[in-house]
Amino acid sequence: MPNPSNRKGKHSAPGQVNVYAKSNEVIVKITGADTDGTFEVVEENCKPGFQSRAHYHIKAFETFYVFEGSADFQVGDELFHAGRGSCVHIPPGVPHQVTSKEGVRMLMIYSPAGTDGMFAAMHALTQEQLMDAELTRRIALLHDTVMIEQSKDGRGKGTILG
């Protein structure tokens, strides 16, 4: 049953949301707390050369919408090139990895919610801790995310954030 305290709309104006900028700028627009855990909305601005660590989500569906730039999405055995206006949807349990040579600005929707806390936890780490694959793997697992392996060229060594 919905929480009566969440019976209000929410406007996420620039600068009035949770912004995490360790490697990429991650902007949590709508949190799981805002939706009683139903979904969350996150904007991510990835720098040129971005490559996430391969991972999957245990319960969450993840949908990406590309606003600017482009990215390659390895989703299971399929590779999608997504440019401006593209949408990529990934069901729970499907391994995926995102790379972008030129940089990309995208919106991510997770349902159910659960990953927004991971961005805050990763942001609180030192640079040395971010490179600790075991530590970041444990943090990710607490937030519905299973890290699979290091990225092929050594990038994305610690976090889902690249």
Indicate residue ranges for each PLM-predicted region.
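Glycine- and acidic-residue-biased ligand/ion/polar-headgroup-sensing regions
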Residues: 59-71, 76
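A short, N-terminal "cap"/entry segment at the start of jelly-roll beta-barrel domains
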Residues: 1-39, 124, 129-162
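A cytosolic small-molecule/anion-sensing beta-strand core signal
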Residues: 67-68, 83-84, 102
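Ligand-binding loop in jelly-roll beta-barrel domains
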Residues: 35, 72, 92-117
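A hydrophobic, small-residue-rich beta->alpha segment in the mid-to-C-terminal subdomain
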Residues: 105, 119-128
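A short, compositionally biased micro-patch
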Residues: 47-49, 59, 66, 91, ...
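Conserved short histidine dyad/triad with adjacent acidic residue
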Residues: 27-29, 42-57
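Short acidic-glycine-tyrosine-enriched beta hairpin
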Residues: 9-13, 17, 77-95
